[in-house]
């Protein structure tokens, strides 16, 4: 049995193992990481011998941690990474190569439909009616999408919403409010089995799932880095943010919105920027906290979208997929029963 895990921003760890009487046997740990002293690897391997094959990645990481001595140095690898590689070797955790993906662009829909599809399409994937996928959003009107647990009145300036005809939606994931005008943002949703991030903390899962898009940004000459917990940023400010929701059905949505351009005046008239966030970010201006991609590249939004689409398709051998009329009808129905309802948008307890 063979499993691999590449630590985001780190090194590759490889585990080979057999299982005898439901326990690990003949475990081998290797990779391009660095350990000091050399015998730390022997101790790590020995700690895994005889471990129950049903052990979680967390339990396996604890075994590795216990085998380390004070002063041991691990570079490019963590005990958690070893645990994930073991789980992958046992077939309990998935890698990207284990998943047959679709890649989808669009269609252009009313703002709230995209938010609803981040729930309805997860249900389709879990039921086997659709493959896991990466979907690039398109929408036909200005919107603000607030996080699942945010207060409408604390995040939204109603006068600005009314003035500019903005749709306010509440998504199924947590995180902060996003001001999203057509043509000024790039948003994608990734629907995957939670087994792809089995054993990872949220802090580990975010950069792991967005590693492919960081590669695209680098190719496009956009200097970006991941800032824990869930921000993509340049040295000048935030480019985008990610959010996730994991369902009990074994699937999850991970989505990211990145600023391509920004109407700073309009954003400040629509969103409220709380004093706690101002103090935390160290600036009095929401605008100064955002660094849209257009500031670093002269490429049109459409070219960046195509680069995302092509890179994901090539990297993960994805098939081009579509959103059907039936998918849209299901999403519209979900808007009527949930996402467009006042009690959802204005934070009723029905969704918690």
Task: State where each predicted segment sits.
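Active-site- and interface-proximal helix/loop "cap" or "latch" segments in soluble metabolic
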Residues: 12-14, 19-92, 293
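Beta-rich nucleic-acid/ligand-interaction surfaces
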Residues: 226-245, 327-336
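Short, charged/polar N-terminal "headpieces" of proteins
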Residues: 1-17
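Contiguous, small/hydrophobic- and glycine-enriched helical/loop subdomains that border
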Residues: 185-232
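Conserved small/polar residues in nucleotide/adenosyl-binding loops
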Residues: 350-352
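A structural signal for small-residue-enriched, beta-sheet-centric alpha/beta enzyme cores
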Residues: 14, 28-30, 229, 238-305, ...
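N-terminal lobe of the biotin/lipoate ligase/transferase fold
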Residues: 87-200
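Flexible, glycine/charged-enriched surface loops at secondary-structure junctions
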Residues: 55-61, 72-79, 133, 221-228, ...
């Amino acid at each position: 049995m063979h499993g691999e895990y590449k630590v985001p921003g780190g090194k590759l760890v490889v585990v080979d193992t057999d299982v005898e009487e439901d326990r690990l046997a003949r475990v081998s740990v290797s990779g391009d990481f660095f350990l000091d002293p050399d015998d730390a690897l022997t101790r790590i391997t020995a700690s895994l011998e005889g471990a129950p094959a049903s052990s979680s990645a967390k339990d396996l990481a604890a075994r590795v941690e216990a085998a380390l001595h004070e002063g041991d140095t691990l570079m490019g690898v963590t005990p958690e990474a070893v645990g994930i590689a073991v789980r992958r070797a046992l077939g309990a955790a998935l890698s990207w190569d284990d998943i047959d993906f679709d890649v989808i662009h669009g269609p252009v829909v009313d703002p709230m439909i995209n938010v609803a599809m981040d729930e309805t399409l997860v249900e389709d994937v879990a039921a086997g009616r659709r493959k896991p996928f990466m979907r690039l959003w398109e929408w036909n009107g200005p919107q603000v999408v607030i996080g699942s647990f945010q207060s409408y009145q604390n995040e939204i300036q109603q006068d600005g919403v009314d003035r500019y005809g903005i749709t306010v939606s509440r998504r199924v994931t947590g995180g902060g409010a996003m001001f999203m005008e057509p043509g000024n943002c790039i948003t994608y949703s990734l629907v995957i089995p939670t087994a792809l991030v089995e054993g990872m903390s949220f802090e580990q899962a975010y950069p792991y799932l967005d590693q492919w898009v960081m590669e695209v940004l680098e190719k496009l000459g956009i200097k970006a880095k991941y800032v824990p917990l869930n921000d993509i940023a340049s040295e000048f400010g935030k480019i985008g943010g990610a959010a996730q929701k994991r369902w009990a059905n074994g699937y999850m949505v991970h989505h990211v919105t990145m600023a391509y351009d920004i109407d700073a005046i309009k954003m400040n008239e629509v969103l409220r920027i709380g004093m706690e966030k101002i103090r935390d970010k160290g600036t009095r201006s929401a605008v100064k906290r955002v660094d849209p991609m257009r500031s670093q590249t002269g490429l049109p939004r459409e070219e960046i979208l195509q680069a995302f689409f092509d890179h994901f398709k090539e990297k993960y051998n994805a098939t081009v997929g579509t959103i059907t009329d039936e998918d849209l009808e299901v999403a519209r129905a979900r808007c009527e029963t949930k996402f467009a309802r006042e009690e959802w948008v204005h934070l009723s307890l029905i969704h918690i």
